[in-house]
């Protein structure tokens, strides 16, 4: 199968799962097909898929991710010893772990083609990530609390792991408790990375998107907590 054939296969199988989409026509243009495939992956509820589907999906995503360009740690600007700064798509990073700013459901973003980090990570990791996260949450039996962290395989991403954390939601004036919870996110991520022998971790700026944490304060806390961790023996 070439990439076009894989994409059409995946779209067709996902459409067949949803009776309401049975009469939907697959568009002819490549970019429109990619948008449709991403949307179908985004809205799909957790659930098993055939081994054939997963093999074709994994081959498709491997080529897509390689085509988007993989970025190694050696290519990133080092600000100080063991502290690096990079601006770009976190799903391209070939590091030990990337951090996902998740929601309390922990199974990804279900809004079709939404440009949040949660959606991007699940899109390029593949459907296995949602299923894996769902298994964790089914065993847990309650929504993920703010300020904690969970680690999963990265599946089709170039990193080894994804660390998921739920940041505080700011509505109105920033409070000390919200700052404490954001600090807890970073500390929990660093702790679980260490427990799993992760040698490099890429943080997004947690809670600064739709969760409305002030950007500058969030960035200062991220750098401070990273430096504290680096300085510890």
Regions found by a protein language model. Name each.
Residues 95-98, 102-196:
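Glycine-enriched loop-and-adjacent helix/strand subsegments that border the catalytic/binding cleft
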């Amino acid at each position: 199968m070439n990439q076009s054939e894989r994409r059409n296969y995946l779209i067709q199988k996902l459409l067949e799962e949803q009776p309401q989409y049975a009469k939907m026509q697959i568009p002819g243009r490549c970019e429109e097909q990619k948008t449709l495939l991403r949307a179908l992956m985004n809205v799909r509820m957790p659930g098993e898929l055939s081994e054939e589907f997963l093999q074709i999906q994994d081959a498709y995503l491997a080529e897509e991710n390689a085509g988007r360009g993989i970025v190694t740690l050696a290519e990133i600007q080092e600000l100080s010893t063991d502290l690096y700064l990079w601006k770009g798509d976190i799903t391209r990073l070939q590091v030990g772990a990337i951090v996902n700013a998740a929601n309390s459901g922990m199974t990804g973003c279900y809004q079709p083609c939404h440009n949040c980090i949660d959606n991007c990570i699940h899109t390029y990791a593949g459907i296995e990530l949602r299923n894996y996260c769902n298994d964790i949450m089914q065993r847990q039996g309650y929504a993920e609390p703010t300020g904690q962290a969970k680690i999963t395989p990265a599946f089709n991403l170039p990193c080894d792991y994804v660390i998921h954390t739920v940041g505080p939601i700011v509505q109105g004036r920033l409070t000390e408790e919200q700052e404490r919870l954001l600090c807890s996110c970073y500390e929990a991520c660093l702790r679980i990375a260490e427990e799993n022998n992760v040698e490099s971790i890429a943080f997004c700026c947690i809670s600064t998107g739709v969760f409305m944490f002030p950007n500058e304060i969030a960035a200062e806390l991220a750098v401070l907590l990273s430096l504290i961790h680096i300085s510890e023996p």
